[in-house]
Regions:
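Acidic/polar-rich alpha-helix caps and helix-coil junctions
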Residues: 1-4, 58-314
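Polar, glycine-rich mid-to-C-terminal structural blocks
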Residues: 1-53
Length: 314
């Protein structure tokens, strides 16, 4: 098949997300990046332990396994990206504070151009996977946030997803449905169906399923009826990549020399120390322009309406 064909046995998503041999035309939004950065790890889980060369534990992972396997962050020194630490291998310039790892060949190449033939990737396109099914099941158990009777079951399945990535679990460890009470950390929060639904909508589904499936996030927002609301909320959130005290992220490169990455880390905007010129804001145009009647669904193709003159007849 032609490289550009939609029916080829390969895809080109790696070219869109990668800064190394790719076009980096798809970059994680600021709010999503910050949500990944702020995920709380389970400090009881040995997968989050960091050891020195002597085998001695010296601390914990800075970012969750879910974050590290979804996006590349310049200061994620416990993960690799195209053969090296992210801050060594990737440029992180032009306000590029993160890159999607999903769909890229970061684990087998040092550059996407290493593929043969080039611009072709054999990574499967994830239409749906078990985590999505678990999260939809949890949503059903609380009936979209209206029924508390299914809370325990919903939490059980959300926590199965979180446990896979060694993230702090939700709910109370004393709950009858707490499967990992002895070996995992729970946040000990008492949830209602509504508060758990909000967590599903704004944290769990977007972080677990980012850029997967066929427009999963777009369809989720549409079926919940909150697309415009979400755009408006996110357009009010401010972030910045301004280096603290003007100090860049510094690491040691492949050649043993010092490497500096300026403006490569994302922070929450603080008006007391940051200027308006330093702010990064998501979805400003979308918040102003989105119209549900016009944009929620694609129009029926002209070819279909021409071929079927009775399409709109009632």
């Amino acid at each position: 098949y032609d490289t550009w064909s939609d029916v080829a046995l390969h895809n080109m998503l790696h070219m869109s997300v990668s800064p190394l041999g790719g076009w980096r035309t798809i970059i994680p939004s600021a709010w999503l990046t910050m949500a990944y950065k702020e995920e709380r790890i389970d400090t009881k889980d040995s997968r989050n332990f960091v050891f020195n060369g002597k085998g001695e534990m010296v601390g914990f992972r800075k970012y969750s396994l879910r974050a590290s396997n979804s996006i590349a962050l310049v200061d994620d020194e416990e993960s690799t990206y195209y053969g090296y630490r992210p801050g060594v291998s990737a440029p992180f310039n032009n306000k590029e504070y993160a890159y999607f790892k999903k769909y890229s060949n970061w684990d087998i190449y040092e550059n996407e151009n290493d593929a043969s033939p080039q611009q072709r990737s054999g990574i499967n396109y994830r239409v749906i996977r078990l985590a999505d099914v678990y999260l939809m099941y949890a949503e059903c158990m609380i009936k979209g946030g209206t029924d508390d009777t299914g809370l325990s079951e919903a939490l059980k399945y959300i926590n199965r997803v979180r446990r896979r990535s060694a993230i702090e679990l939700l709910g109370q460890s004393t709950d009858l449905g707490a499967e990992y009470a002895r070996e995992a950390t729970y946040n000990e929060t008492i949830y209602t169906a509504q508060s758990l639904m909000e967590h599903l909508m704004y944290i769990e589904r977007p972080l677990e399923l980012s850029i997967e499936g066929h427009a999963i996030r777009q369809i989720d927002l549409r079926r919940w009826g909150i697309t415009k609301q979400r755009f408006q909320y996110l357009s009010q959130q401010k972030f910045t990549n301004a280096d603290p005290q003007g100090t860049p992220y510094t690491t040691i490169g492949k050649d043993g020399k010092e490497v500096k990455r300026w403006g490569a880390r994302l922070y929450r905007f603080n008006s007391t120390i940051h200027t308006e010129a330093q702010k990064i804001v998501d979805y400003e145009q979308a918040a102003g322009n989105y119209n549900e009647k016009m944009h929620a669904y694609y129009p029926i193709p002209n070819g279909e309406t021409m071929a079927n003159p009775n399409l709109y007849n009632k």
